């Protein structure tokens, strides 16, 4: 599948347009005031002027593919700047969420961190004065023109952390990502099933797969974030992009609206009928993905960041699709850009930190990402994944989501500062049949309404 530079950059702009209306250890001081502007000190690209530096970097690039790319980029950076030593602390997404704030408020915070967008993480860090605005570095390195404006907006907050997608820039992202359905081509072919395009087509296949003795959907939610993805793509494919986008951004709607309750009912029905892994709350995401990779399930629902693992396990038999509502040619799914690479206010070497961020997100980095099976936020020129491959599927679905009216919705946990915990716990209770779909929706709405009232 061939895609020109213009097409790739158009996709990035389209992604932004879909999301612009919307709104996945050590490293200063323990008390920082919110910074309304970037540092008064002049910024520089001269990394050598810093002398010998140990740059502490916290990231969540632990998965195969993205970890390989990060290791290679760190190696290249240190070769280019031999006066800099990268001290990398890499943790899973869930571990990073629970430990990063403690690190940022320590006496020796990291220099560079990956901060999750939205109110729970980035908004909290900004309000606490823990992240440095990067607008000056964006001009110095050209991030303000390299990245589409709407992508940059996802990494912006007002200095008090109260308003997302406006104010100062607090990071740039390395990857693009969407959540979708990975499928086993061989299993579908053996059962005479076509690749589903809508949520109804997908659901219609599940009884046939189950009757064949095969598990339809491998699913593990011990980390809790997979539950957000499961509900997100189901809700999006039922409710549609506009309804979910306006809900997450607090513009209209309620989590107790009929489509959101229907999405919860759909997921609980899958659990009741044995369409997803039994006891999923005690099974890890990686174990579920491994079962899919061994050919023990027809589908697994997760993000494009897992494509290197699927390529390794299934090779040509692995496929990827994003589902859409009935009657729509555009899939609707959860996604956006990867976690922002941010500079902490406690960093003693912000110029070096900015040079590092530029190095791991620039055009050269995009090619390294692609070479290791990842989807970059801004793709390099003449990117052309081989037709019929999983990487081509991912590129095609990324394009479909970001063309026309757009079908990309933000991650649901961006909705409130506490929504990650509320939603992830509620999905576990939903699949364990400890909450009815209506009770599930009411729990989400209670959190959401309280946040809107507090603004």
Question: Which sequence ranges carry the predicted segments?
Answer:
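Conserved N-terminal structural module of periplasmic/extracytoplasmic solute-binding proteins
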Residues: 2-130, 195, 327-329, 368, ...
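Hinge/lid segment of periplasmic solute-binding proteins
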Residues: 120-178, 319-321
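Glycine-centered hinge/linker elements that transmit conformational signals in sensory
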Residues: 208, 249-281
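Short helix-initiation/N-cap motifs at beta->coil->alpha
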Residues: 90-99, 199-204, 279-293
């Amino acid at each position: 599948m061939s895609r020109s530079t213009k097409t790739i950059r158009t996709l990035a702009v389209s992604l932004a347009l879909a999301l612009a209306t919307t709104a996945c250890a050590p490293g200063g001081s323990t008390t920082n005031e919110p910074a309304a502007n970037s540092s008064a000190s002049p910024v520089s690209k001269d990394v050598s002027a810093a002398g010998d530096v140990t740059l502490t970097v916290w990231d969540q690039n632990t998965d195969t593919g993205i970890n390989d790319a990060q290791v290679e980029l760190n190696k290249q950076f240190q070769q280019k700047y031999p006066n800099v030593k990268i001290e990398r602390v890499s943790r899973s997404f869930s571990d990073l969420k629970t430990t990063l704030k403690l690190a940022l408020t320590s006496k020796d915070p990291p220099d560079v961190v990956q901060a999750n967008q939205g109110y729970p993480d980035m908004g909290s860090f900004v309000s606490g004065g823990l992240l440095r605005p990067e607008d000056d570095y964006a001009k110095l390195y050209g991030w303000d023109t390299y990245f589409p404006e709407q992508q940059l907006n996802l990494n912006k907050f007002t200095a008090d952390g109260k308003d997302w997608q406006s104010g100062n820039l607090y990071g740039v992202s390395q990857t693009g990502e969407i959540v979708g359905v990975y499928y086993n081509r061989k299993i579908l072919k053996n059962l005479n099933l076509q690749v589903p395009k809508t949520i109804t087509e997908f659901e219609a296949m599940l009884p046939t797969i189950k009757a064949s003795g095969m598990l339809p959907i491998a699913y593990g939610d011990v980390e809790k974030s997979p539950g957000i993805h499961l509900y997100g793509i189901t809700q999006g494919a039922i409710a549609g992009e506009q309804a979910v986008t306006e809900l997450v951004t607090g513009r209209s709607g309620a989590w107790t609206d009929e489509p959101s309750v229907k999405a919860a009912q759909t997921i609980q029905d899958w659990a009741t009928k044995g369409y997803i892994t039994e006891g999923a709350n005690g099974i890890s995401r990686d174990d579920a993905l491994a079962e899919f990779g061994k050919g023990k399930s027809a589908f697994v629902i997760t993000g494009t960041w897992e494509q290197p693992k699927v390529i390794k396990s299934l090779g040509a038999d692995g496929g990827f699709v994003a589902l859409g509502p009935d009657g729509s040619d555009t899939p609707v799914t959860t996604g956006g850009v990867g976690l922002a690479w941010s500079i902490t206010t406690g960093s003693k070497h912000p110029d070096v930190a900015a040079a590092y961020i530029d190095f791991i997100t620039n055009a050269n980095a995009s090619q390294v990402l692609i070479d290791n099976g990842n989807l970059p936020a801004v793709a390099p020129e003449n990117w052309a994944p081989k037709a019929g491959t999983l990487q081509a599927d991912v590129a095609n679905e990324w394009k479909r989501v970001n063309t026309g009216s757009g079908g990309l919705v933000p991650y649901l946990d961006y909705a409130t500062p506490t929504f990650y915990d509320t939603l992830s716990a509620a999905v576990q209770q939903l699949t364990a049949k400890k909450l009815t779909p209506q009770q599930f929706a009411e729990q989400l709405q209670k959190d959401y309404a309280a946040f809107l009232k507090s603004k």
